[in-house]
Amino acid sequence: MNILGIGSALPEQVVSNQQLEEFLDTSDEWITSRTGITRRRVMKESELTRLALAASQRALLDAGISGQDLDMILVATTMGDYVFPSTACLIQEGLHAACPAMDLHAACAGFIYALDTADSFIKAGKAQHILVVGAEAITRLANWEDRATCVLFGDGAGAVVVGPGEGLLSVRLTARTDRDALYMLAEPGNNPFTRKPDEAPGGVRMQGQDVFRFAVSQSIEDLNQVAAQAGRTVQEMDWVLLHQANRRIIDAVRQRLKLDPARMPGNIHRTGNTSAASIPLLLDEMYRAGLLMPGQLIAMSAFGAGLVSGACVLRWGKEPPKTLTPAEDLFSPPANIKP
């Protein structure tokens, strides 16, 4: 499998830490020092489909194909604009495509799960061109009274078009169920014959220390495994992309693997945790900035509710775009992060 095209889209609305100070018992210093986040993008109601479609259109344009050339659409998302039809079906409609389309739910690791799924269809000879999307409106799921969690999240969409090739060198997917570490209850239905849950829905709930320990240890294990499967070490990778969940997690993984900060770009300071969209958003930003060159090895790792994780090694095959968009602050996150 090779990546043939890539694109992304972000909501227009920017919410700063200072805006959160207006209704939360928090401060810019508190948020930045514990998460590395200074601002995030927030979608309007029912905007996910539009942004996912925009990211998809940009990926198709970059790949030089149209929606009619697609054999499948896979969308990694936690919750779309509709319970049904799927976000993938809505994208298919917008692209005037005529192919199978389905959503895939693996929380923040969903994009890597979807990449591996696409690779399997291509290797089986069932598809030539697959659109893989990571799109999230995760802020709509947040409990905006819980300062420990709501400050973390942001919205966005990223997409890639993949086709046959040998670019995906290794993949590792894991699941270790711990529902209490990170979860959100479904809204109770209106069926009068079913018992309502004892615990009312209240947005995302998280045991922060448990998630931190899992994220750091699992990311290190996954990165070492996929690098070894590719016949390399993590330290030999040209780039290491970690799910943009929390700057302290990213820094802990980098320090324990003794990785050069110049090989671990990040955008969490201005996007927040965009769940399944975080890896494709960062990858597209690097591509548009001219940082990705043919032949470079890219290790990617993500983790999320489940608890689940996914990692892979890609050999990049695309030339940089003709028009570049500078992204200097990918290597200059906020300096006041607490260890």
Give residue spans per PLM region.
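Condensing-enzyme catalytic core mediating Claisen C-C bond formation in acyl metabolism
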Residues: 1-45, 146-213, 217, 221, ...
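Conserved small-residue
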Residues: 3-5, 31, 73, 114, ...
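Short beta-strand segments
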Residues: 7, 76, 105, 130-136, ...
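Acidic-glycine-rich active-site phosphate/pyrophosphate-binding loop
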Residues: 24-31, 82-95, 132-138, 189-196, ...
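Claisen-condensing/thiolase-fold acyl-transfer catalytic domains that form or cleave C-C bonds
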Residues: 49, 53-56, 60, 79-80, ...
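Anion-binding (especially nucleotide phosphate/pyrophosphate-binding) glycine-rich loop
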Residues: 62, 66-98
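Short glycine-rich phosphate-binding loop at a beta-alpha junction
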Residues: 68-76, 234-243
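Flexible, glycine-rich active-site loops centered on histidine and acidic residues
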Residues: 123-157
